[in-house]
Amino acid sequence: TDEATSAYEQIVLQFPEHPLAADAQYKLAQAHEESGDFDEALEAYVTLAATYPRSPLIANVMIRISDHFYKNEEFPIAAEVGKKFLEKFEGHQFASRMAFRVGQCFYKAEKFGTAGESFDLFAKSFPDDELAADSMFWSGESFRMANNDREAFRRYNRCRWDFPASDAAKYARGRLALPEMLRQFEAEANSVENDN
């Protein structure tokens, strides 16, 4: 791949204004990535974004960068790249996947409140997506891990009501049987009685 890297570098250097120069820059970054040198790949991706900011390849660049940091368990960085992606490319075909990934990143980084909010945003932004039930369950999990039983209880119930046939609803029903969720059920029932 040294030959490929060299060839792409030559194209970018000799023909920076050519319509395919951005493609060559992207291929250069991929060649570095495939050879295991992500630092060089990252530099080439950043150069692509800076030099060709209108390139349709920018979305792919951001996905690859976020993926790299996710796979290397650098979840806060992966989440930030994902959030920037969603700001720039909200209508992209992979926007829902990236939005879900942002929630996963915050959860794995143990930023549970932010994870819950991210999964809620996913459910609001992509209500018909195949991951909508999972996002509601994971919102519940996130809030439960943040010791916010009230919000967790509500997300588990919403998952169960809105997506009754899903695997996520099955897991949500299991979580609702936890002692802290049963206590929350009693607290909510008592508050309804007291309001009447």
PLM feature segments, named:
Residues 1-196:
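Acidic, polar-rich low-complexity tracts and alpha-helical solenoid repeat scaffolds
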